[in-house]
Structures are given as C-alpha cells and as structure tokens.
C-alpha cells in the first residue's frame, strides 16, 4: 500500500476508532491529516505525533490526500467527502482501512455486543506480557499505553470488530472472539434478530480454514450459532462443557481470583489467575484473552501475569478515587461506558461486589432515542436496582427526539416502578453540582453512558476539590 499511498486523510479523526488507525499509520510513516468538529485530547495527541489536524470540515482539507477515510458518523454531504468524490480521491470506510492494516499482520478480531473493548485490551496485555508485542487498535484508551493504539513489532494485530453497522464483515482475521450476541443496533439488521445472528456466523466464516473461532458459550445466542460455525473452534465460559473455563471464582478487594482450567494433550491443566478487574463478566473477558493467548503459543504464566498487571482501559469501570464532600465525608467516583441494560447490569453487579455494604449512586445518560425506545422496560428494570439515581437527558448521537423515549419519560417510568426515586437532570452541565448535593459519606457514585457524561467524573472531582478547599 505504501508505494502508492502516502497521504491519508481522516474525516472525523477524533473518534476513538478513527484515531487508533491514524496513530498506527503515523507510526508506519504515512502522512496523516484529519478533521473533526472540535479539538480534543485525542486530536492534540495525534498532532503531537505529527498529524495535521483541522478543526471543522472544509473542502480544502483533503488537498493532496491519496485516500480519504470516513467513519459511519460522517454523512455523504460532508464537504470533505464531496470534495474527495469530485476530485476522484478514493473514499473508504474506517473498517476497510482497518482491514488493510490487518492484511500485513495476523489479525485477531474481537466481536460481540458487549465487552469488546475490555476483551481486546486484555488480549493486548496478555500477548504483550508474553513477549509477542502485538499491534492493537482499541475502542478506549489503554491506561498502561496512554493510548488506544500502538504499533508493535510482533506478528499479531488485535482489534475490535464492530457489528453495529455490520462493518466487521470487512475484516478477514486469523482468529476471532465472539463475547456475546444481544439486541442492539437493530436498525442495521431490519429489527430482525436472526439477521444479526447470521451476520456473526458470516463474520466467523471469514476466518481461514486454519484459523480459530473463540466463542463464549455462556451466552445462549452464541451457543445457538455453534452448529453453523465450520472453522476450528475453542469455547470458553463458566459452564463445565467449555474448553477454557473458570473455577473457584471469588472477588477480593476489587479483583477477581479464579483458576483457569483447560485441556492440553488430553490432560487437564489448571492455573491460578488474579484479574485486576471486578465482576464475573470480566472473568469471561479474561477467559477469552487466555484462550487467544494459548492459541498463540504463549506461556500460561505470562498470560496470567498480563491479566494481573492490567491497569484498565478508559471509561471501563475507571476509578477516579475519592472526593471530599461539602458536608463532610468522602465518596468514591467510578466511570463506565456502559449504555445497554445488559452491560449496565453486569457493571452494577461488579460495583456491588467491589464495594459491598456501600450505597450505590448511579448517574446515567441514555444514549440514542432509538435504543431508549427499543429497550425501555429493560432500562427501567436495571435502573431500579440502585440505591439512588440521577438521570440525564438522552444523548442523541445525531438522532431526532422520539416521544416517550426521552430522559423524562424514563424517569417517570422508574418512579412508577417504585423502587428508587430518580432525580432528572435536564442539562448535563448541571450534573456534577447536582451529584454533590445528593452524595452522602461512604457513597459510591457510578457515572454511566456512551455520550457526553464521560466528562462528568473529571468535572465532579474538580468541583469537589474547589468546594472542599
């Protein structure tokens, strides 16, 4: 690719999926430019690495580019897309550029409705600790690396495979993980769950005959597609029939301790693991990483060490520490990207396990009106399990409002359910101050959502420090 393409332009370069690919291409020596609607820490990091960054979109930004890369959030009438089309510059989706990178490595693609980012990060950590130095492109900032992407010297490229727009069907990995299959982004699949399942089967069929599918059979929908997978297969889970399973699981001080059990040359093998993450759902994510590591020939001791040393990924049960409250005492702040009822329930269970006997305060910003509408009753159920609830207005992600699927409607439904009295916060900017007024000594406050609520924990910490002073 390099002898024909020198300059690659990204429209929407600040996005987490786009920025990772851009960073790897910069390291490979390509000229990278890009635009986004606003500057951010991500665009500043890319600029420091040598990318030419434009704030805002304009036709002239694509001048000199050999190819233009777009994310699914970029519309066809974007001025840079239109200028590239008029100039005959190839326009490729993000997933296609990731597929090009994967052609030069042995691709390991992590798919599934929930857990992709954490699992991808754990795989990268385990393979790195085993000396395999993988390249990775992750949908979140890996704390140890300070970035969501890195070019490694090894043979493997570990990346998330996105089913939300079916773009994972562009990829041709050598190994693939499916963590679970759940109803989300159903507009892509005509609101037909069977079509969604078939897409995962088609994704796995893109593996070569010598490849490896690593599937979580604790998930009933993943188990349902097993008969249709015709590639070499490794299963993982907590169930006794899994090829790689966890035994003797116990939570200790925010970590999960367990024994991993697997077969090797007909003999049962067992090794203790200390996972530096809370929650049984993260035990499953760790099992996927172990299965991949074993398939890559890594030593189980090195794999386990990588899981123990794992320092987390941004916005995945990210701990901000304790804040001082204006009325005295302290509260612990944790932030998480969860925005689907299933992953929210898993994260809330992890929080209960990590902080037993403490009041759990959830500040949640729903993401997309369509998701809120389609999963309304599920949201009411999971939101009713916390001790105190603050609800922000829906983050639209480009969608128009839908009647009876906004934050107020959700708050009313939770109130009617009668298990918790929600506080509705219309302006996300008011959430930190409202939280401080609500918090009590010893509380754990968990901010959750995929939208602008990600800025709330930092602002809460700053505001608390100002008021405490």
UniProtKB/Swiss-Prot annotation:
GO terms for cellular component: cytoplasm. ATP binds at residues 112-118. Signal peptide: none annotated. One of its GO terms (biological process) is regulation of cell shape. GO terms for molecular function: ATP binding; UDP-N-acetylmuramate-L-alanine ligase activity. InterPro entries: Mur-like_cat_sf, Mur_ligase_C, Mur_ligase_C_dom_sf, Mur_ligase_cen, Mur_ligase_N, MurCDEF_pg_biosynth, UDP-N-AcMur_Ala_ligase_MurC. Keywords: ATP-binding, Cell cycle, Cell division, Cell shape, Cell wall biogenesis/degradation, Cytoplasm, Ligase, Nucleotide-binding, Peptidoglycan synthesis. It comes from the Bacteria. Its main location: cytoplasm. Its EC number is 6.3.2.8. It catalyses: UDP-N-acetyl-alpha-D-muramate + L-alanine + ATP = UDP-N-acetyl-alpha-D-muramoyl-L-alanine + ADP + phosphate + H(+). It is found in: Cytoplasm. Pfam families: Mur_ligase (PF01225), Mur_ligase_C (PF02875), Mur_ligase_M (PF08245). Cell wall formation. Belongs to the MurCDEF family. This is UDP-N-acetylmuramate--L-alanine ligase. It comes from Laribacter hongkongensis (strain HLHK9).
């Amino acid at each position: 690719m390099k002898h024909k393409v020198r300059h690659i332009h990204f429209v929407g370069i600040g996005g987490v999926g786009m920025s990772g690919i851009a960073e790897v291409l910069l390291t490979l020596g390509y000229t990278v430019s890009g635009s986004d609607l606003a500057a951010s820490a991500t665009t500043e990091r890319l600029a420091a690495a040598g990318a030419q960054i434009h704030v805002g979109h304009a036709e002239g930004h694509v001048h000199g580019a050999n190819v233009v890369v777009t994310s699914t959030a970029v519309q066809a009438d974007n001025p840079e897309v239109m200028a590239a089309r008029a100039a005959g510059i190839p326009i490729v989706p993000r997933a296609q550029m990731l597929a090009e990178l994967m052609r030069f490595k042995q691709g390991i693609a992590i798919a599934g409705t929930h857990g992709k980012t954490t699992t991808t990060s754990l795989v990268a950590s385990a393979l790195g600790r085993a000396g395999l130095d993988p390249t990775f492109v992750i949908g979140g900032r890996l704390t140890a690396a300070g970035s969501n992407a890195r070019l490694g010297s090894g043979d493997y490229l570990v990346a998330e495979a996105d089913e939300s727009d079916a773009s994972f069907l562009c990829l041709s990995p050598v190994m693939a993980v499916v963590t679970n299959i759940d109803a989300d982004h159903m507009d892509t699949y005509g609101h037909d769950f069977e079509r969604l399942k078939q897409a995962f089967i088609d994704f796995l069929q893109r593996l070569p005959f010598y490849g490896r599918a690593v599937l979580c059979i604790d998930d009933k929908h993943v188990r349902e597609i097993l008969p249709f997978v015709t590639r070499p297969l490794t299963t993982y889970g907590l169930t006794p029939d899994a090829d790689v399973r966890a035994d003797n699981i116990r939570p200790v001080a925010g970590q999960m301790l367990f024994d991993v059990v697997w077969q090797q040359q007909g003999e049962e093998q067992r090794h203790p693991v200390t996972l530096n993450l809370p929650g049984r759902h993260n035990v499953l994510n760790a099992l996927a990483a172990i299965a991949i590591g074993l398939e890559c020939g890594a030593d189980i001791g090195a794999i386990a060490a990588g899981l123990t040393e794992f320092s987390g990924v941004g916005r995945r049960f990210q701990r901000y520490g304790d804040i001082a409250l204006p009325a005295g005492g302290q509260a612990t702040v944790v932030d998480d990207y969860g925005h689907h009822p299933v992953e929210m329930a898993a994260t809330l269970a992890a929080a209960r396990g990590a902080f037993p006997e403490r009041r759990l305060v959830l500040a949640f910003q729903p993401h997309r009106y369509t998701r809120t509408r389609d999963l309304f009753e599920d949201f009411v159920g999971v939101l009713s399990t916390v001790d105190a609830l603050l609800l922000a207005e829906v983050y639209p992600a480009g969608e128009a409002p839908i009647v009876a699927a906004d934050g107020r409607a959700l708050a009313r439904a939770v109130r009617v359910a009668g298990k918790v009295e929600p506080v509705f916060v219309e302006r996300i900017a008011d959430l930190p101050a409202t939280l401080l007024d609500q918090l009590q000594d010893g509380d754990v406050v968990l901010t959750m959502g995929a939208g602008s609520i990600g800025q709330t924990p930092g602002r809460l910490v700053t505001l608390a420090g100002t008021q405490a002073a």
